[in-house]
Amino acid sequence: MDQKRLTHLRQLEAESIHIIREVAAEFSNPVMLYSIGKDSSVMLHLARKAFYPGTLPFPLLHVDTGWKFREMYEFRDRTAKAYGCELLVHKNPEGVAMGINPFVHGSAKHTDIMKTEGLKQALNKYGFDAAFGGARRDEEKSRAKERIYSFRDRFHRWDPKNQRPELWHNYNGQINKGESIRVFPLSNWTEQDIWQYIWLENIDIVPLYLAAERPVLERDGMLMMIDDNRINLQPGEVIKKRMVRFRTLGCWPLTGAVESNAQTLPEIIEEMLVSTTSERQGRVIDRDQAGSMELKKRQGYF
């Protein structure tokens, strides 16, 4: 393939497909982490392209916290059924028994128990030795220094000082028993690339990414969309309908909306061209403590 003749999106596509095929061939029991967001949708689309006309040679895994938007759950089930994917859903039973939730226990504890520990439980339960994730280097500074093949010890911990070189698209996947890797095929993509590719390939996404009138309240400088009745309003708080959309999706109490009128993909792309803020500015888990994301990744977060 002549790389010089490819557009930058086709070059990124080819690189990602190469990585996905490499992992499928090299590891005995891979899995694709499916968080239902735009990056997961692109990664799933690339995986389907990589093995077309066959089916995916690995399952999808959703680590469920019980606090995703209802539209995300509907989209997840519809997508898995439409594409004939094997979908595994894991929810930390200990966290459920303890009644862990972001309002009572805070974002750090909720994320640690329901997401990090839940993910490690699922990986151990099924014995996966490689897990695809949709993280990109432009999202956050700790992800910017992480390799495409991110090695984890037998406790799923990441050591940023112990990473392997990746020269000329050559990846060293050798691991010892009990170790595993997290693989990030979208590492070199940007948010703008993701949106342009979604438009180019007509990839289905959760409607929450498109602007619409939604019930929100402002709390701690964040526009929180009220998705169900599990919220207790604080004195002076009022729920109002506002024109908002989401740049990133997660647990609804921890994911801030942004005011926007972008109701189509071209309008989102145009909006991104002038944006000066990170898409993850609305994610509470990224700023609940100093060096938050790197600390979470060292503990086993994806």
UniProtKB/Swiss-Prot annotation:
GO terms for biological process: hydrogen sulfide biosynthetic process; sulfate assimilation. Pathway: Sulfur metabolism; hydrogen sulfide biosynthesis; sulfite from sulfate: step 1/3. CDD domains: Sulfate_adenylyltransferase_2 (cd23946). Pfam families: PAPS_reduct (PF01507). InterPro entries: PAPS_reduct_dom (IPR002500), Rossmann-like_a/b/a_fold (IPR014729), SO4_adenylTrfase_ssu (IPR011784), Sulfate_adenylyltrnsfr_sub2 (IPR050128). With CysN forms the ATP sulfurylase (ATPS) that catalyzes the adenylation of sulfate producing adenosine 5'-phosphosulfate (APS) and diphosphate, the first enzymatic step in sulfur assimilation pathway. APS synthesis involves the formation of a high-energy phosphoric-sulfuric acid anhydride bond driven by GTP hydrolysis by CysN coupled to ATP hydrolysis by CysD. Belongs to the PAPS reductase family. CysD subfamily. This is Sulfate adenylyltransferase subunit 2. It comes from Escherichia coli O6:K15:H31 (strain 536 / UPEC). The lineage of its organism: Bacteria, Pseudomonadati, Pseudomonadota, Gammaproteobacteria, Enterobacterales.
